[in-house]
Amino acid sequence: MSRFYRLLIVLLFCGTFVSYSQQRIYPDYNSSSGFELDSLDAYDPLVLDNLETLARVWGFVKYHHPAMADTTIHIDYELFGLLPRVVHAGKAERNRILSEWINELGAFEVDTTFQQELSAIDHILINDFSWVEDTVRLGSKLSQTLSDLRYAISKSNKYVWNEGVTIKLYDDPFPNYDYNHLYDAGYRLLILFRLWNAIDSYCPNLNMT
């Protein structure tokens, strides 16, 4: 069982058994994400695989898509909209939904010049994004979109501040709940997805986690 699956099961039982889009209008998610899971979902291989795939794709888009340069897209709310559509979907349907979602965020230009220069010298990659090339899991279309997105031209990203040798990550604040408020499944998954992707994308000691 993968580290992600173990974290996911623990989380599910915590407290319960170029041209980008115009400004998005989202439902009011302040009181609830509107998404819940039941106890059986923690044992369903389809659900677990869908949630892991969604976590990876969502986080990859968060840190790579040029649409994240401003406040047009609220990436957390995008997740809340995707969860009910993806969680019980078949693999082909899931991949179609995710591929269409990325396309809806807007077109982007690709520049592989840096990668070509990097491949010509000896180097060590701290983080492994080879999973985007897994066409068995992602299908050819989604895999190609993510592979292109890896080299998308982006002037800035509101979730990542690059200050020379220092990288700072930013996330949108949670609603101001009472201290004893129990987050629903959507918000708990958001917490896990944020942590997972921050480590997977930027942790220099990933092999030790």
Indicate residue ranges for each PLM-predicted region:
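Flexible, low-complexity junctional segments that flank or bridge functional domains
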Residues: 21-209
